[in-house]
Amino acid sequence: MRILFISSTRIGDAVLSTGLLDHLMRAHPEARFTIVCGRVAGGVFRRMPRLDRLIAVEKRRYSLHWLEIWGQLATTRWDLVVDLRASAIAWLLWTRDRKIIQGGRRPGHRLTHLAALLGVEPPPLPVIWTAPEDSARAAALLPEGRPWLVLGPTANWHRKVWPAERFAELALRLTSPDGVFPGAGIAILGGPGDQERSMATPVLTALPQALDLVGKLDLPEVAAVLARAAMFIGNDSGLMHLAAAAGAPTLGLFGPTPSDEYGPAGPKAQAVLADGPPGQGAMEDLPEARVLEAAKALISQAAQVPA
């Protein structure tokens, strides 16, 4: 059986789609998969089992990239095409069955929309795939012996970024002798590129003892690092979704984006909202004290979740 899975360009959306993909793998244990996704999101799928091909979409003018992708896929007879991009390509391929998500924005969480595409209830939660070498790298970076608080102070939009000084002060409080994680190590994650580095630099400067992992790991290694975290606290970003998928207690910080649509998903994941109407708040209006109390509550909640 051959399944074509057309996922997203952005890391966060790609991570959210892994639950649906994991469901397909369980439902069709004999199937082989081809994944089409954005270049940046490719690392989300690189380690998945039964992967035949991973095709990166490099955008072209006039959407000519889809013509190139079609050329790579048209000679295969597919058993199922799942298209999460609502592109025309799924209609132009030979397949026994196709599932194409409806375009446009709709109320409700993205996971619910994805699950409805295949009629799955409850919505399958995102997962991560890593290799032993990824776990070994993570273990070397975040050795056992003390807990690790991982911060994600970056985002793809400056308005989604919580003030750097609040990240730093929160980390110091959580790792203080009377904090939730006394003596814990602090690691700071972010993607490659100058923008990510510039967002993370003020936090790194304020926390000179922190482990700087910004732009230094690929996505499977990042996932393995997050799987070792005692807690992840970060802005609404792909890292936040990856942390929740990795099983880390995850606190997502939300202001101008709707947490009811894109909040972190999982039994140990929560969103903390800034003041103002949902999805219309300013990150400056998210008090540090609110995040601190949410972190304490989440740790208590996570302790009740079966391993």
Q: What is the role of each PLM region?
A:
Residues 1-307:
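Catalytic machinery of carbohydrate-active enzymes
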